Amino acid sequence: MKKLLSIIALNLLAFNSFAVELKTTNPYPNLMPAQVTEKVNSMGVRKFIISTSPNVDGSTWDYILSHISSGNIEWLRIVPILSTGVDAGSAEDLSTAVATALPKNASGVLSVLNDSNVSISTESVCSLPFYQGTEAELNQYVIDSIRALYKNKGGGKCLQKLIETTGNSKSFSEGD
């Protein structure tokens, strides 16, 4: 009986440790854009971004970026707010997320670009800010983005940057 109780106690302790770890890596599960805005207003944008653990895989920051990457307009609308509190690493993350949304919602992406803010400038977002993916995936992204931008009246500057970057790039090699 004592052995059974000690096993149960250890299992509860292990589960509790797992739950605590889960909570520290994602303190805001199921976060919506309106809640992000509320948190930013109450905490300040920089403190909020720090609280999302931008350097931890599976964090709230990753959750936010995945929704921005989807091209959902509500998530894209909070990009200008978030961009004012990013550091170098999270700025790159944000640029990449916005760039990923480009072929999915070019109008939404173009509406949040701001050339006076490096992390969401045309230069950063429209110049293939990717470090991962295969050549086929990158090629498909370029084709889909060109199509999306070509169909959008305001897409000329981003389209020009995308084509310029593609034209100036060297051949792709996995593992570089």
Give the residues covered by each predicted segment.
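Non-catalytic all-alpha helical scaffold/repeat segments
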Residues: 21-176
